[in-house]
Amino acid sequence: MSDRFVYVTYIRTTPDKLWQALTDAAFTREYWWGMFLESDWKKGSPWAMKFNDGRLNTTGEVLESDPPRRLVLDWHNEYNPDLIGDGPSRATFEIEQLGEMAKLTVTHEAQPKLLNAVSGGWPKVLASLKSYLETGKALPNPANCPTAKESAA
């Protein structure tokens, strides 16, 4: 894993609530546009990200789990055929309490093709997570939103 994407955001929430939002299927469905995660989140356990209809998107193993501070996942794309051959990657979630907010740092290490895909996806997902935790309302899925140019047409 030669390349790395790092995203840092500050969310008005507690580390416990943020951990729950990252690991609880009911939470992830709300801000990840129907996607949900399944695992017991113990070190060595399998985990899976699934579409709302149950199809697999991503699978892997929980490499580290220290609630509510650190979660490290082995990450295997199962859905996009162009990315399956890019090999496994690693996603690390670090949570730190800062007064009334939690600092979330997401680091994703991957080969270039997969890294390009996740570096476009993480900002959207994490912005929606932040909105959901702070306002109770997730952002719309950017894939379903017209651009300004399309709206003007």
Where are these regions (language model features)?
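Exposed loop/turn and edge beta-strand positions of beta-sandwich/beta-sheet ligand-binding modules
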Residues: M1, F5, L56, S89
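Short, charged/polar surface micro-motifs in flexible loops or helix N-caps
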Residues: D53-L56, E64-L71, N77-Y79
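Beta-strand/loop substructures that line and gate deep hydrophobic ligand-binding cavities in soluble
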Residues: E78-K124, L129-S131
